[in-house]
Regions:
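Adenine nucleotide-associated cytosolic modules
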Residues: 1-167
Length: 167
């Protein structure tokens, strides 16, 4: 941004990428929990922008492979930090499975990114909203009853089988 040519480079990029449709490109996303309506770039562009700095750590091929990983996380106290960090890094961006039956209590606030206004809410709902605000295109498979005899088969076998499960 401090580059003298930044403004001209940005104009060239926008014109090349969007032609004359900069204002009409992208999609609208509505977050009903906070009443916000935002205009953002398309799925592929958002993913590329969010993972752009990973290029110094892993190759584009590796990034694409990790994007397609399906990760399951059971328990969203410490697991909530794992989930959001995976999403920030662009891992498991196609599909993520989360299982948690518990509600957020004050004693959880030392390990869960949430505020006191979230106390009493289901941990899985708090995290799902945070993840959708990072990546509104992600497919989340939520198991608000946690894992039990009824949900286990679906968690490990339906849609896409998890490549990796954290508990």
């Amino acid at each position: 941004i401090n580059n003298k040519n930044y403004s001209s480079q940005l104009k060239i990029f926008l014109k090349t990428k969007f032609k004359d449709k900069v204002r009409t490109s992208g999609v609208w996303v509505y977050f009903p929990w906070n009443g916000k309506l935002i205009h953002t770039v398309k799925k592929e562009d958002l993913y590329e922008l969010r993972t752009n700095r990973n290029r110094n750590l892993i190759t584009k091929i590796e990034q694409e492979k990790l994007k397609k990983f399906c990760i399951g996380i059971v328990g969203l106290s410490v697991g909530s930090n794992l989930a959001s960090n995976l999403i920030y890094q662009g891992l498991s961006s196609d599909q993520l499975k989360l299982a948690e039956f518990d509600i957020l209590e004050t004693t959880n606030l030392n390990r869960i990114k949430a505020g006191i206004s979230d106390i009493g809410r289901k941990k899985i709902d708090v995290l799902a909203q945070q993840i959708y605000e990072i990546d509104p295109y992600i497919t989340l498979n939520l198991y608000p009853e946690g894992l039990n005899e009824k949900t286990l088969t679906h968690f490990i076998g339906s849609n896409k089988k998890p490549d990796l499960i954290f508990e």
